[in-house]
Design a protein with these regions (language model features):
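Extreme N-terminal starter segment of soluble prokaryotic enzymes
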Residues: 1-2
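Residues forming the Rossmann-fold NAD(P)(H) cofactor-binding site
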Residues: 107
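Short acidic/polar active-site loop segments enriched in Thr and Asp
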Residues: 123, 148
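Conserved active-site tyrosine of GNAT-family acetyltransferases
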Residues: 142, 147
Length: 161
């Protein structure tokens, strides 16, 4: 496997990988959060929201994106962001083709991203994910890579009632 800088030629493949990678996540998350919250975040469905958000990432910050290839096929990608005011880098997006999950692709993308962040002079790296059951595999990967969970509580109240 090799990891290369993003090219717009990879855009559609990365969007496809992301939707397939997160296909099992969102139904489980939907079951774990209040309906009014899910509907507020995903009024046109999770796929539409994710596509919109990911297109923006790929179009607005291509220099922050790295792509994992197996042969000539893209199998995953990662986007990093640097927050110098906090001396911190962030793994903002990570997605691995379901056919290549649990083969070390995510781990290698995490290590690649962490090295880029360290090379930028940052003192720490952060990754954020959901606490719902759909995101349990992501949390397991992050913990296996030495990330420590920061307890955060996020509350929502339905004002339509």
């Amino acid at each position: 496997m090799r990891i290369v800088s993003y090219s717009p030629a990879y855009r559609e493949a990365l969007l496809d990988i992301s939707l397939r990678a997160w296909e099992p996540v969102f139904p489980r998350m939907h079951d774990d959060v209040p309906e009014f919250v899910y509907d507020a975040f995903y009024p046109q469905g999770w796929q539409q929201r994710q596509l919109s958000d990911l297109k923006e990432v790929l179009d607005q910050e291509p220099e922050n994106v790295s792509v994992a290839f197996e042969g000539e096929r893209p199998v995953g990608w990662v986007c990093t962001r640097i927050h110098p005011e906090d001396q911190m880098g962030e793994i903002y997006v990570i997605a691995v083709d379901p056919k290549y999950q649990r083969r070390g692709v995510g781990q290698q993308l995490m290590e690649h991203a962490s090295a880029q962040i360290k090379d930028a002079g940052m003192r720490m790296v952060m990754v954020e994910t959901g606490g719902d059951s759909g995101h349990a595999p992501a949390r397991a990967l992050y913990e296996s890579e030495g990330f420590v969970r920061w307890p955060v509580a996020r509350y929502f109240k339905d004002l339509s009632k």
